[in-house]
Amino acid sequence: MSFASDMKNELTRIDVDEKNARAELSALIRMNGALSLSNQQFVINVQTENATTARRIYSLIKKVFNIEVEILVRKKMKLKKNNIYICRTKVKSREILDELGILKDGVFTHAIDPDMIQDDEMKRSYLRGAFLAGGSVNNPETSSYHLEIFSLYENHSEGLAELMNEYELNAKHLERKKGSIVYLKEAEKISDFLSLIGGYQAMLKFEDVRIVRDMRNSVNRLVNCETANLNKTVSAAMRQVESIQLIDQEIGIENLPERLKEIAKLRVENQDVSLKELGEMVSTGTISKSGVNHRLRKLNELADKIRSGEHIDM
């Protein structure tokens, strides 16, 4: 199963009391429900592609309203593998929609009903229902960090974003072609949201993966930095050796001042060491990195004069 499926499976096993079941069910039916007329009575169909979510809807309706619920299974068309699960209720449809704040004075409302989010537990339950209905989260092992909840109605998405931001999640909403989404892009905020709606095992797995990814990225950055520094050191050393060899051909290293002569010999003999290490090899006593750099720069300047044909005074 995918990371998102594992998470939804975990969320559907959370035990809730009737009050919080009502809040969760309100989100599920508002987002995935449809009303139809059959044999002169209203029928509520709540549709999902996730079998565990279908079982959750079934159990929540039974818990809150204690009525008969059917579960139907449909095959998707056009070679799609997933089944479609439909939870259907044929009685008390008007009462259900009224009590869940989906129907107000005979009119369907798309905004979150304040009665469904009266306290912290109900808010968490509503968000859990919203994620079960329209949520997805990228696998943190293979993708960029991204969690989103799709809703058909923009004002409902705005309400979800406001609700999530009560918990400082930095949620944003965006209009899409057939609806709108609320999304999180920051790994820390995604982790907080998973915990908020009760997905503690998913949160722990997400955090484990995030830590490994962050460590791997840090190591890669360190290796890249050290490689770049090493390449820079090697390039500089090669140029210094070329300059010293040119000086030896044209003037002779033995004719250089003593302080330049020794550092020239040391550099040719130790081409892969750093300036600091080179300074520690000087026979007259350790000299600083800047001191070594100053002497090598003098040698490069002398070689440049030779290359340009300038007169050299020793």
From Swiss-Prot:
Pfam families: HTH_WhiA, LAGLIDADG_WhiA, WhiA_N. Keywords: Cell cycle, Cell division, DNA-binding. The keyword Cell cycle applies. The keyword Cell cycle applies. GO terms for molecular function: DNA binding. SUPFAM superfamilies: Homing endonucleases (SSF55608). GO terms for biological process: cell division; regulation of sporulation. Residues 274-308 bind DNA. Involved in cell division and chromosome segregation. Belongs to the WhiA family. This is Probable cell division protein WhiA. It comes from Staphylococcus carnosus (strain TM300).
